[in-house]
């Protein structure tokens, strides 16, 4: 009886210790109370990058004045100045590899690195000479292709469109169904492409409250987040494989 009881007690102790350890690994922002949130970045503004799709509209008091600066609903203009018809609902300007768009009447505009508001101001300054002196046009710019990708140990791996042009890593993970219990929260991989096409990677720790002050807290367009499986997932997979093998062996032996 004692021989049976001792392994059971040891197993119970191991499970208890593992549960305490796993709680520390699962909780987000564990040291948040000791961190100064005043140091966090202010309101985030996305910056335009090559291959972004921009939707731009110009409004004036007289519609005929702004008409030349607006694409029709089913048209799109490329950087070589060619106007093409599109059967889809999306319209807009594709930023070329040099960071330029070809805007009607005005011509080529360099928009790479600008925020949405800066791009609006630039376009407004360029079209003013073509408008009546009394006109005060309203220019609206939207990034219609803004998206991030979340894969790995999450509830719903997916490509997530960002309609607000602002998304934190926490929001992205939440939309992807959050991390599963087997997700490695202390070592999230973020892959980011810069304006030159070079890819960079960094590791983020969701357990650390300092993440909120990180320059990687807010995601850029086309960021990729990968959540690795933790050791428990690997161990469970190994145990599952071994168990299946032993059941197969036992089945063969008992059938003889």
Spell out what each predicted region is.
Residues 14-17:
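Bacterial Sec-type N-terminal signal peptides, specifically the leucine/valine-rich hydrophobic h-region
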Residues 2-5, 20-256:
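Ser/Thr/Pro/Gly-biased, low-complexity, turn-/loop-rich segments
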């Amino acid at each position: 009886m004692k021989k049976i009881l001792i392994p059971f007690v040891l197993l119970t102790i191991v499970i208890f210790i593992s549960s305490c350890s796993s709680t520390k690994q699962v909780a987000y922002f564990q040291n948040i109370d000791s961190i100064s949130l005043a140091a966090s970045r202010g309101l985030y503004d996305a910056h335009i990058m090559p291959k972004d799709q921009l939707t731009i509209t110009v409004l004036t008091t007289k519609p005929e004045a702004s008409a030349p600066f607006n694409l029709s609903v089913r048209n799109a203009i490329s950087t070589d100045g060619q106007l093409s018809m599109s059967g889809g609902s999306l319209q807009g300007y594709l930023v070329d590899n040099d960071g330029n768009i070809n805007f009607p009447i005005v011509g080529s505009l360099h928009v790479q690195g600008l925020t949405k508001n800066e791009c609006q101001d630039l376009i407004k300054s360029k079209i003013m000479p073509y408008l009546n002196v009394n006109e005060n046009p309203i220019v609206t710019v939207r990034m219609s292709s803004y998206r991030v990708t979340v894969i790995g140990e999450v509830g719903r791996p997916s490509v997530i469109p960002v309609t607000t042009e602002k998304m934190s890593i926490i929001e992205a993970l939440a939309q992807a169904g959050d991390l599963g219990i087997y997700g490695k929260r202390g070592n999230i991989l973020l892959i980011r492409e810069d304006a030159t096409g070079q890819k960079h990677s960094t590791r983020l720790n969701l357990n650390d409250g300092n993440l909120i002050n990180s320059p990687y807290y807010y995601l850029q367009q086309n960021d990729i987040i990968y959540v690795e499986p933790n050791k428990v997932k690997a161990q469970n997979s190994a145990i599952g494989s071994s168990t299946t093998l032993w059941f197969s062996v036992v089945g063969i032996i008992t059938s003889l």
